[in-house]
Each structure stands twice: as structure tokens, then as C-alpha cells.
Curated annotation (Swiss-Prot):
Induction: By bacterial infection. It is found in: Secreted. It comes from Megoura viciae. This is Megourin-3. Contains four disulfide bonds. Keywords: Antibiotic, Antimicrobial, Disulfide bond, Fungicide, Immunity, Innate immunity, Secreted. The keyword Coiled coil does not apply. It comes from the Eukaryota. One of its GO terms (biological process) is defense response to fungus.
Length: 63
């Protein structure tokens, strides 16, 4: 028997779409986040286009 939160965590990868400051921070945080159930592992960190802010969005394989 699974509760709603457990089911949601399997269907929805929480790491997908997470935003980090800086490429290195994203790579570390995203790799960890994409190890969660439903994520399928780390795919990439995508730079969010903005000249002043160095922000990166996390993508997991099955996100």
C-alpha cells in the first residue's frame, strides 16, 4: 500500500527542472537529485539564458 506522496515521488522526478546557481553546483546537485526514484539518472545542466545570472536548470533522464 502506497500513500499519495509515495506514488507522486515515483511518477514525478523532483530533480527535473530544479534551478542551481553556477554550472558546478548544478552538476553536483543535479546528479544527486536525479538519483531519486522516478528520475532515471543525471542527463544535463542547461544554462538559463541571462547575461547577469549564472543559473542552470537540472534535467534528469526520465524527467
Amino acid at each position: 500500500y502506497l500513500d499519495v506522496n509515495q506514488i507522486a515521488s515515483y511518477l514525478l522526478c523532483l530533480g527535473e527542472g530544479a534551478v542551481f546557481n553556477g554550472r558546478k553546483t548544478c552538476q553536483i546537485g543535479c546528479r544527486a537529485a536525479c538519483q531519486q526514484p522516478g528520475c532515471g539518472g543525471y542527463k544535463e545542466c542547461e544554462q538559463i539564458p541571462n547575461i547577469r545570472l549564472h543559473k542552470y536548470r537540472c534535467h534528469c533522464i526520465s524527467g
